[in-house]
A protein has these predicted regions:
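Secretory pathway export signals and precursors
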Residues: 26-32, 36, 78-84, 88, ...
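Short amphipathic alpha-helical interaction patches enriched in hydrophobic/aromatic residues
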Residues: 44, 64, 89-92, 231, ...
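Iron-sulfur cluster-binding cysteine motifs and their immediate structural context
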Residues: 2, 31, 35-59, 76, ...
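Conserved aromatic-histidine-acidic binding/catalytic patches
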Residues: 28, 89, 93, 160, ...
């Protein structure tokens, strides 16, 4: 891609200017300083200004003011090419909430029939749990039973983990059996919000918050960030963060061939960049294994929700340097704290024939307890 966006310029003046697609305050915050460029995975791959946060905000401004027509192909391409990792937010001196702008952009670009068919299918299925059951995607044992009190913290069963990785929730409950698992849980709406339907994403988050009492604990970093945005950070905790705050002391050690296992971490982008949670998973891993900080652990793995399905070649281009770093680190395990990352890493490691295994944080800690017995 070599298409250049309109050159960065001052924001449009005056109230009521533009189409009303974006939060004008957020658009106006961007001062086009370029601090975001090195943090952006797609800009690092292409060196293309249009594929940077600064360039994309310039495109958003051009769409808002009518400088670019709504059907301009660069708008469609760049709104899709962005991973939505929000790494740019952590280095932005102006405090631009880029993730919010991206959701608004995709609300426009992916409205109605313009939404990719696979996104339409997935969002329809996860918003209707009975469809998951009908299609056999949720196994009978996928919903574990917790032993917590009705008004205690609730373990939220993520849509993806419920169907593909039920062992993660079971491991979480072995570690914290006091967690309550209310029946009838629905989708939190993160998938919708990130894929052009932020209104449904908000409604589903609020509905889930009303259905589940107390603190919501989730084993998915992306769900945690989405729920915290709509329900408030005091009501939502990612599982590792919950363990850390509750003073959980991991038991046992993870061993491989009689030695302490070497374990690295793949950060969840939204957990790290959206909620600022970085220490808890590292400290928990270090308590049961030899923790190895892999270069680029905080960089996106290329999963990015539906991105790996919509743009597999671009997703692999983001993942491949990470796979090389994992191989160089000679790990026994790499830990993920988000189901999309877990899937991405497992597929990549399998493709390259690596000996490293990708596991969820809850699974690693449960494995340590098993080794103790």
């Amino acid at each position: 891609m070599t298409t250049e966006p309109p050159q960065p310029g001052p924001p449009a003046e005056g109230p009521g200017t533009g189409r009303g697609l974006f939060d004008k305050e957020q658009l106006d915050r961007c001062i086009s300083c370029g601090f975001c460029l090195p943090a952006c995975p797609t800009y690092s791959l292409t060196g293309d200004e249009a594929s940077s946060p600064r360039g994309r905000i310039t495109l958003m401004r051009a769409l808002e003011t009518g400088e670019l027509p709504a059907d301009d192909p660069t708008l469609a391409e760049e709104s899709s090419y962005c991973l939505g990792c929000r790494a740019c937010e952590t280095v932005c001196p102006a405090g631009v909430e880029y993730g919010q702008l991206l959701e608004q952009w995709r609300d426009h670009q992916w409205s109605g029939p313009k939404r990719p068919w696979i996104v339409r299918l997935l969002t329809a299925v996860v918003a209707r749990p009975f469809l998951l059951r009908l299609q056999g995607l949720v196994r009978r044992h996928a919903r574990p039973s917790g032993g917590g009190s009705a008004d205690g913290p609730s373990l939220m069963l993520g849509c993806v983990e419920r169907g593909l990785y039920p062992a993660v929730s079971r491991a979480a409950l072995r570690l914290r059996p006091e967690l309550n698992v209310p029946p009838g849980q629905g989708c939190c709406g993160a998938l919708h919000a990130h894929n052009g339907d932020s209104a449904t994403g908000k409604a589903l988050a609020e509905e889930l918050g009303a259905r589940l009492p107390g603190t919501l604990v989730t084993t998915a970093g992306g769900c945690a960030a989405h729920l915290a945005h709509h329900l408030g950070p005091d009501r939502v905790r990612e599982f590792g963060d919950h363990l850390h705050r509750e003073g959980h002391v991991p038991a046992g050690r993870v061993t491989v061939d009689g030695r302490t296992a070497r374990v690295g971490l793949q950060d969840s982008c939204h957990l790290r960049n959206g909620l600022g949670v970085t220490r808890p998973p590292r400290e928990l891993i270090a308590a049961v294994a030899e923790y190895v900080e892999v270069p680029g652990a905080g960089d996106c793995c290329g999963a990015a929700g539906t991105y790996a399905m919509l743009r597999p070649a671009d997703s692999r281009a983001v993942l491949d340097p990470k796979l090389a770093a994992l191989a160089e680190a000679d790990l026994d395990f790499v830990v993920a704290v988000n189901p999309g990352c877990l899937r991405q890493l497992r597929q990549g490691l399998r493709r390259t024939g690596a000996r490293t295994r990708a596991v969820h944080l809850a699974e690693l800690l449960a494995l340590a307890e098993e080794d103790r017995t």
